[in-house]
Amino acid sequence: MGRLNYSITPEGRFARAMGVELPISPKHAREICRAIRGMKVEAAERFLQDVIALKRAVPFRRYNRNVPHRHGLVGWPAGRFPQKAARAVLRVLENAIGNAEYKGLEKERLVIGYANTKKGRTFRGWMPRAMGRATPKNQETVSIEMILTEVR
């Protein structure tokens, strides 16, 4: 595995966390990061917990072919409930919050200033089929980086 670094280093007081090679969908991870970018930390936590509980949908803005409309979405009709990816993003967010508290930042003033995904390794796999054939069954991975900034 190659070395991963953070894409940006912001000015001022910040905390950051990274989830490396998480076995989740890259498309779901990208849409979730786009949805929570700019939110306050507490609102983002609530949003992700509601997605896991199937109460709020994540708007799918890019990868929305054959995605049904969901009630409750404002400004964008297509959405889904990517639970597995939401759990992974929530873990990264909780790590970033812990890092912020360790650095002495106030949780009430934290905003998700940067949330981004990067493509990770693809783990090759094969599924045996009839007549001695095999079908590829690969596992894609995603690296998520999150930077929390303190607003005044």
From Swiss-Prot:
Top-level taxon of origin: Archaea
InterPro entries: Ribosomal_uL22, Ribosomal_uL22_euk/arc, Ribosomal_uL22_sf
Pfam families in UniProt: Ribosomal_L22
One CC-aspect GO term: cytosolic large ribosomal subunit
Keywords noted in UniProt: Ribonucleoprotein, Ribosomal protein, RNA-binding, rRNA-binding
One annotated GO molecular function: rRNA binding
One GO BP: cytoplasmic translation
Family statement drawn from the similarity comment of this UniProt entry: Belongs to the universal ribosomal protein uL22 family.
Quaternary assembly: Part of the 50S ribosomal subunit.
Function text: This protein binds specifically to 23S rRNA. It makes multiple contacts with different domains of the 23S rRNA in the assembled 50S subunit and ribosome. The globular domain of the protein is located near the polypeptide exit tunnel on the outside of the subunit, while an extended beta-hairpin is found that lines the wall of the exit tunnel in the center of the 70S ribosome.
Protein name according to UniProt: Large ribosomal subunit protein uL22
